[in-house]
């Protein structure tokens, strides 16, 4: 049995926090992208935070999720931050160059 993948979005002032839960793969990421993008475009935050603390598994789709939200943050004039990454996931993100796009 696989854990349900979902996002819990919290907005405080101009800070947008997307708390991700479950496994991130090519099957589960698209609905998360759509929900995050719709809420961010509606609220136009100055800071966009992706919290990976609730993520149990992530394939390269997680990198794609970050890259797409970086582009969205650029459109909004917002800063992108990543938090809650495991040491292994953080290293993979760094190898992929995500530390050039987002603050960890």
Identify the residue ranges that each predicted region occupies.
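Short beta-strand/loop segment at the start of cytosolic alpha/beta domains
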Residues: 1-19
């Amino acid at each position: 049995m696989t854990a349900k993948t979902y996002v819990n979005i919290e907005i405080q002032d101009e800070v947008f926090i997307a708390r991700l839960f479950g496994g991130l793969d090519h099957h589960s990421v698209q609905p998360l992208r759509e929900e995050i993008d719709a809420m961010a475009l509606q609220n136009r935050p100055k800071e966009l935070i992706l919290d990976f603390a609730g993520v149990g598994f992530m394939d390269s789709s997680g990198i794609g999720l970050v890259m797409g939200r970086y582009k969205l943050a650029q459109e909004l004039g917002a800063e992108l931050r990543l938090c809650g990454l495991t040491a292994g996931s953080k290293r993979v993100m760094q190898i992929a160059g995500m530390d050039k796009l987002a603050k960890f």
